[in-house]
């Protein structure tokens, strides 16, 4: 990682925030988890140790053996379960200072899109029988905190763009979020949802109402972590509050949006939170166009 200014920036930022639990998105997966363990070691060298990790195999780049994107060929990145140049590209990494409980860990990444309740899938049968719902991965687990289990649900949903009038990616994104909402119905409390839904409640492409429905889930609270940088970079044509934006995308479209969320269950006490987006960008490189969202919670 020594030659990557972006990775060095990410390590410094994480070490300065000092999270107990961290969900990293777009982290390439390998079968032996060498990259994940190297990142752990590099983070420890920065002064912040996160001893425990979970890295489910992502759907990105996983071959389906059929022509999904309709280009007349099989085996391209558009024919994978989710777009990817290789299996494991842009995966999901969960790090923690508290041990994960394997008995409560469940990977929902292999559930087929056509089989979820009230599916929006319109894929033909030959695609529907293989197409998974999760764009990257969807994982639930728990940690023990002060002798009490805290459940976690994390996922990275499809971008609701890069398609056509058929809105396939938009419909898949909506169903991923709706499926997560159904999992929350069954999830024991207390819990925390950590997700890149790729969907803003008000602005940008996608089924925005689905995001508003998730935020209004009766078991969730939305602390609305904010930043001065988001406010200072406001897109005047947007409806949503700029201070809540979490990603710095090109203007004017899509512009800055709120797509990254930490949503605790209602029985957790929210102490503090924010989005790491300084009002004035420093010359040093950003870790990512997605800003780090953080939330401090305590047991009631």
PLM region spans:
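N-terminal, active-site-proximal structural segment of metallo-dependent hydrolase catalytic domains
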Residues: 1-92, 148-150, 281, 298-300
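Acidic/histidine-rich helix-loop elements
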Residues: 1-7, 122-126, 161-172
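Metal-dependent phosphoester-hydrolase catalytic domains
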Residues: 99-111, 171-192, 197-300
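Extracellular polysaccharide-degrading/modifying enzymes targeting complex plant/algal/animal polysaccharides
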Residues: 64-86, 90, 96, 101-126
